[in-house]
Amino acid sequence: MALPIPKKNKAVPFLFAGSFASGKQRTTRSRTRVRGTVEAGFPSPAEEELVDTLSLDELLIQNREASFLLRVTGDSMTGAGIMPKDLVIVDRGRTAKSGDIVIAEVDGQWTMKYLRKRGENVTLVAANPRYQPIRPKHELKIAGVVTAVVRKYT
């Protein structure tokens, strides 16, 4: 299945490139220092040392030219750890397969859901049991596959 590219979406060349919705872009890159590891289970002695540096763009975006950001509204994907106000990174160059979280236009409405395929039947499934599965009546266009979620805690 070919992934149509929505006309209003533009590739954002850098992960933190400003507001996708407003079209503003800031094209600075930075590398963040990796200072070691932290135990998320039982406490361990703390040691800090410079281990490496990394670019969040390189870590989170595999296909820069085909990727863009969307800000999440609604709570249908909270069971997948995607919360309102999160940013999702979408790769419109990936072929969507069953089980992927996709951005889809279904019967004229945009949504983010799990893609489920069984033979010729396609269903979009929320990660929140309060929402019913969506079975396209007329048309389904997959705009891209969600590849990462970005959340700011403060």
Regions found by a protein language model. Name each.
Residues S67, K97-V102, T123:
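Short, hydrophobic/aromatic-rich segments at coil-to-beta transitions
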Residues I89-V90, I103:
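Hydrophobic beta-strand signal
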Residues M1, N9, I89, Q132-P133:
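A structural signal for the main folded, soluble domain(s) of proteins
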Residues M1-T78, Q109-W110, K117, N121, ...:
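Short, positionally conserved secondary-structure boundary motifs
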Residues V106, T111-R135:
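PDZ-domain C-terminal substructure recognizer with occasional recognition of PDZ-binding tails
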Residues K85-D86, D100:
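Structural motif
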Residues F68, T78-G79, D86, R92:
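Short, conserved secondary-structure segments in the cores of folded domains
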